[in-house]
Amino acid sequence: MTSSEAASPGATGRPLTDFEQVLLGVIASEPRSGYGLKKMFGSSPASVYQPSPGALYPALRRLAGSGLLRAEEQVSSGRRAQRMYQVTEAGLAVHLEWLRKPVVPETVGAELGQHLMRFSLMEKYLERGEVIAFLGDLGRALDGFVRGMEEFIAARPEIMRGHALLALEHGIAIHRASREWVGTAMAALSPMPGETSPVPGG
């Protein structure tokens, strides 16, 4: 399965793409129209899941056809009818399964953007302990990734030089910085002594 595919299948058994999972998460937080989603993604500084022209509406239709979204026509005074999308119970179940998908150490480099997006969508639905456990797994996977890249360079001193070496060092720096962020996030989310863990969304 590629990094663009999510493990949770829809009603048709087809694995959802990460973008479709992001759509489920965004719509689960608030019913939205296709136009509203287009504006939201267009104004977001994050480019990882900005849909290409013509990709958004087919994705919404696929999710609705799979029973993961429900569409309702709404008419406001003086405005054209809008199709508002809401997540169904089946859609929410599929989305929660995706949020809880384990971090795979072997693919953490390719899937780092997906993991960060999942983290951003966890706040509403997962207990803080689950989120901290996810971050712990992510941190360990990043440690292994950085260590593996460093060992790769050390084992090939005769060819790891020039631009190739600089490019790999960039990858190491990026993932080491991500590992440092994981530690900061875990510290920020860890309860203080005597503090109880809030319910999801709290």
Model-derived segments and spans:
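Alpha-helix N-cap/N′ positions at the starts of helices
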Residues: 18-19, 114, 163
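Amphipathic alpha-helical dimerization/coiled-coil segments
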Residues: 97-147
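An accessory alpha-helical subdomain
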Residues: 134-137, 162-178
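Acidic interhelical loop/turn segments
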Residues: 148-168
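Short, contiguous alpha-helical
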Residues: 172-194
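Short, charged, intrinsically disordered terminal tails
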Residues: 193-201
